[in-house]
Every structure is written in C-alpha cells, then in structure tokens.
Regions:
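PEST-like low-complexity, intrinsically disordered acidic/proline/serine-rich tracts
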Residues: 2-325
Length: 325
C-alpha cells in the first residue's frame, strides 16, 4: 500500500540550494546565442534555467470568473450574497480578482458526485484549501501560484524550487525505477520532443487542489506537461489532466510563464508553516480560542480569558510585564 508522508516543515532557501549542488555540478556551460534574443541551449536543447512566474488568476479559479468576495453567506434575496466578517475587515483586499479561464473549453468535466464535492469544497474554502495549511501545492498548481519558482537544468535532471513553502520537484530525464510512495509534487519523468520538454507526472497524493475554488482530484491523477520556449523570456506551458475517478474525460490547461528579469531576481523564504500554526495546531492549545458560528460564517474570539492565577505569567510571556509597585 502506498504510504503518504505529509511533510510540511519548511526549510530555508539556503538549505535547498545545497540540494542543487549535484545538478549544478553536472550542468555544462550554456551555449550563448549570437544575439541577445536567441535562446541559450544545453547539449543542443533549450535551456529553461532561470526564475519564472505566472501572471494570471488561475490559483483563484481555473475557470473564467468575475470579481467576488472571498467569503460570503446567503442574503435575503436569491442570487444576492452578504459579505462575511473576514471580507468586511479586509475591504477591497477581501475580494477575488476576476480573470479569464486557463482551461480549454472553459469547463472541467466532473463526474456528478465530484461536481457536488467541488461545490462543497468551494463553500468551505477557508477550512479545506490545502494552500491555507501550507501543504505543498502539487502539480500543476505549483506552476501558477502567485510566487516565483526557479529552474536549474542539467543533462540528466531538471530541478525546480518553489518560493511557496520552499517546495521542490525533480524532473528525471533518464529512465528511473517507479517511486514506491505517493508524493505531494508527484513523480516526474521527462523527455524531449524536438524543442518541447514533455513531463509525465504520476504518484500523487489526493490531498492537493488545483485552485482556491475547490477544484480537486484523487490519487489516480496523471498529468502530462509540455514546456516550450516561445522566446527566451516566455515559456508556453500546457498540462493535460487525467483522473478517471473524478473526471469524465481528460482536460487541458495552458498559460504563459514569464521570466523574472530583475538583475537581482532570486527566491525569498516563504516559510508559511510559521504563518499557519493556529490553523494546523490550534486544537492542541491548552486554552483553545473560542469559535462560534453565525450561519455559515465561523467567528474566532482571539481575546481569550486568562486562567485564574496565570495573569502575571501571561504578561511576561506577552512582553507586557506588570508595573512595579
């Protein structure tokens, strides 16, 4: 039986850099083109090395969508929503930006039971989205998160490091034995079809989503990626999705990925585990935060009462010691 090890501890970018030493050591010097607009090459193949980032709203919703509040609750009139408390507090920042879809045909072909599950996921997005818990994003979602990622290309493998959660993946360009476990980022084996890198990704966990709109998959997910340089600063990215347990047919997404051109472009640490300790481990608190529901909105009272006898200790812990008498 496949084992799922949910490793969510973020490591520093410096630690991940050490992992890349083997890839860098085997990496031959790129052959520079005659002009600045031509594509660098390694062993006769396009060199994808660099820092890249998508520029779309696919992480919010793969399909075409209008701007709408992140969280809402039913209003008195049909098709009218009432903003939930978190949205009111955030103002315009609490809204999802509108965007054009990246799915071919603008439709995800769910089986009936899965369509109902997707709708339920979307309604409970704040409780269920793995991104909120700092889980590794999976593929293809990692490719269009609103965070940059770095590609380092060698002869036998290509390494990708993602700023979000310091996630990483390896694309093996030589024949490898099947991996014995499931992986958050899948198991990737690539080959070249002319100027296009084709990557077969399998052995996924079922714990990742495609976006914040509740689009999901099972552990039978199979992704075929295609990377083609439109020019030296733009990758045309395609991903064909197969999952017979969830979808009625295969479907495809496509988008451009853009090279970051700043002279000092680099990945920064985004150790999101430290940002979600309450979400991940709040249930282990000795004195848990008070939660109550108003309709479909969960309110959290962060002004908890200090247990009797612990007032002085709590003041020192919070950096607000009692005044000296």
């Amino acid at each position: 039986m496949k084992l799922l090890i949910k490793t969510c501890l973020a490591v520093s970018a410096a630690t991940l850099a050490a992992i890349l030493l083997y890839v860098i050591a085997q990496r031959p010097t790129p052959v520079s083109a005659a002009t600045s607009d031509a594509v660098d090459r390694i062993a006769g193949k396009p060199d994808f090395s660099g820092i890249w980032e998508a520029n779309n709203t696919a992480n919010w919703d793969l399909l075409t969508h209008q701007a709408h509040p992140m969280v809402a609750q039913p209003g008195l009139l049909p098709n009218t929503v009432v903003l939930a408390a978190p949205v009111l507090a955030l103002g315009s920042l609490g809204w999802v930006p509108g965007g054009l879809g990246v799915v071919e045909g603008d439709e995800i072909p769910y089986q009936p039971w899965a369509a109902a599950r997707k709708k339920e996921n979307e309604e409970h997005w704040l409780d269920r989205d793995p991104e909120l818990k700092c889980f590794q994003p999976g593929i293809p979602r990692g490719m269009y998160l609103p965070h940059p990622f770095q590609i380092i290309q060698g002869n036998s493998k290509i390494q990708m490091i993602f700023e979000f959660a310091n996630a990483q993946r390896t694309i093996h360009l030589t024949k490898m034995e099947p991996y014995p476990n499931v992986l958050w980022m899948g198991y990737s084996v690539g080959h070249w079809e002319g100027e296009t890198l084709v990557v077969d990704v399998s052995d996924f966990t079922d714990a990742t989503w495609f976006d914040r709109a509740g689009d999901f998959h099972s552990d039978a997910l199979h992704v075929t990626e295609r990377y083609t340089l439109a020019d030296k600063n733009v990758i045309h990215y395609e991903a064909t999705i197969q999952d017979p347990q969830v979808f009625t047919r295969t479907w495809k997404i496509s988008m451009p990925l853009y090279r970051r051109l700043e002279p000092n472009a680099q990945l920064m640490d985004f150790k999101c585990v430290e940002m979600v300790e309450e979400t991940m481990y709040g249930h282990l608190r000795k004195h848990q935060l008070v939660k109550h529901w108003e309709g479909k909105t969960m309110n959290v009272d962060i002004t908890r009462k200090i247990p009797p006898g612990e007032e002085v200790l709590e003041r020192y812990i919070s950096g607000n010691p009692p005044a000296k008498k």
